[in-house]
Swiss-Prot record:
Superkingdom of the organism of origin: Bacteria
SUPFAM superfamilies to which the protein is assigned, alphabetical: ALDH-like
Protein name per its UniProtKB record: Gamma-glutamyl phosphate reductase
Gene from which the chain derives: proA
Function in brief: Catalyzes the NADPH-dependent reduction of L-glutamate 5-phosphate into L-glutamate 5-semialdehyde and phosphate. The product spontaneously undergoes cyclization to form 1-pyrroline-5-carboxylate.
Location relative to the cell: Cytoplasm
Organism annotation: Thermodesulfovibrio yellowstonii (strain ATCC 51303 / DSM 11347 / YP87)
Length: 418
């Protein structure tokens, strides 16, 4: 069977199953997710065995250590997936929630109710944990899901989906609620994103290349972030000890994440006082430093920064450093080079803090806090499917609520249009 038909069949299976999960009770959805967690626990050895095949294949192909690390499943990582499902069970179910209700002059009551989106297509790369994470979230929000993982993780994902489907079946739910496109060719992605009317929303999770391909070719609405080019601006009125701690955390704690700082901006009035200790601390942590001319005068060890570097999402221990005249120049820099993801100011000046919050147009803007905190759990929203830099439907961490939409509901007692 050709790829086009195979992808269509999988998507139709998800579409047909979506009405059953959409009307499922919270209790049933939670039971399914609990069973998924139990089955993962019972099948750890099988999962690690399947994953080992993917890891060995990746090593033979010379794939980078960073990618192999993301690909690898360990007992600890499976436990984290199980914990993630358990946390989804504990979250309130948004489906059926009436968010507004108002009375019209004719006595008619009009309201808005949260309902599932329907069928969500998730396209991702070499991270098998995404298979479980997004399934739990989509299912709890009453959606069926069409998964297409990276070819590097195909054996791991097939093993995971088999377990997830068994849990659905054993709780009496249609197995088509979770479908996996086990076709490694890129054509499968291009066919999947054409299926308007069957798949309702596409969420790509991966590198900039994948997200750009999906966005430029999809006939279905796409919820995404291209990349995280995040900034911390250290204002002249900053608490410098606090600034040092925030900047170090934003870069070093987990540099491969989308909310890690890529450029540090420093007000020229405090640059000579702040930069020597800060940059030495980064250097000791193994951070490669690239700086502007003013930075080099203060700390000659830094490499020259090029303009194209300011657009880069390094996802590594590499940092751009720029000395700016004031808050206005900092905001101009962020506006030009940033990706509208996560940006922070460190300052004791309330007016500057409010100016930064108002003028920096990102999914999350921070005052005196690390960009690494742009996260569903950190915000108290629970598990997330990703962080959106879009402005339509969802922006910032996308949790259960963002995997629903609303419909109008109307209560009348005989009203007609005059």
């Amino acid at each position: 069977m050709e790829i086009k038909q195979l992808v269509l069949n999988k998507a139709k299976e998800a579409k047909e199953s979506s009405r059953f999960i959409a009307k499922a009770s919270t209790d049933l959805k939670n039971k399914i997710i609990v069973r998924m967690a139990d089955y993962l626990k019972q099948n750890k050895d099988e999962l690690i065995k399947a994953n080992r095949i993917d890891v060995e294949n990746a090593q033979k192909k010379g794939i980078s250590k960073a990618l192999i690390d993301r690909l690898t499943l360990t007992e600890k990582r499976i436990d984290e997936m199980i914990k993630g499902l358990q946390e989804v069970v504990a979250l309130p179910d948004p489906v059926g929630e009436i968010t507004k209700m108002w009375l019209r002059p004719n006595g008619m009551q009009v309201g808005k109710m949260r309902v599932p989106i329907g069928v969500i297509g998730v396209i991702y790369e070499a991270r098998p944990n995404v298979t479980v994470d997004v399934t739990g979230l989509c299912l709890k929000a009453g959606n069926s899901v069409v998964l297409r993982g990276g070819s590097e993780a195909i054996n791991s994902n097939i093993a995971l989906v088999k377990i997830l489907k068994e849990a659905l079946k054993d709780e009496g739910m249609h197995e088509g609620v979770v479908t996996y496109i086990d076709i490694s060719q890129r054509e499968a992605v291009l066919e999947m994103i054409k299926l308007e009317g069957i798949i309702d929303l596409i969420i790509p999770r991966g590198g900039e290349g994948l997200i750009r391909t999906v966005t430029e070719n999809s006939r279905i609405p796409v919820l995404k972030h291209y990349k995280g080019v995040c900034h911390v601006f250290v204002d002249r009125d900053a608490d410098l000890a606090m600034a040092e701690e925030i900047c170090f955390n934003a870069k070093v704690q987990r540099p491969a994440t989308c909310n890690a700082m890529e450029t540090m901006l420093v007000d020229e009035n405090i640059a000579k006082k702040f930069l020597p200790n800060m940059l030495k601390k980064f250097e000791d942590a193994g951070v490669e430093l690239k700086g502007c001319l003013k930075t080099k005068k203060i700390y000659p060890k830094v490499k020259d920064v090029k303009e194209e570097d300011f657009y880069q999402e390094y996802l590594d221990l590499v940092l751009n450093v720029k000395v700016v005249k004031n808050i206005d120049e900092a905001i101009e820099h962020i506006t030009k080079y940033g990706s509208a993801h996560s940006d922070s100011i460190v300052t004791k000046d309330y007016n500057k803090a409010m100016k930064f919050l108002k003028e920096v147009d990102s999914s999350a803007v921070f005052v005196n806090a690390s960009t690494r905190l742009n996260d569903g759990y950190q915000f108290g929203l629970g598990a997330e499917i990703g962080i959106s830099t879009d402005k339509i439907h969802a922006r910032g961490p996308m949790g259960l609520e963002e995997l629903t939409c609303t419909k109008f509901i109307v209560f009348g007692n005989g009203q007609i249009r005059q």
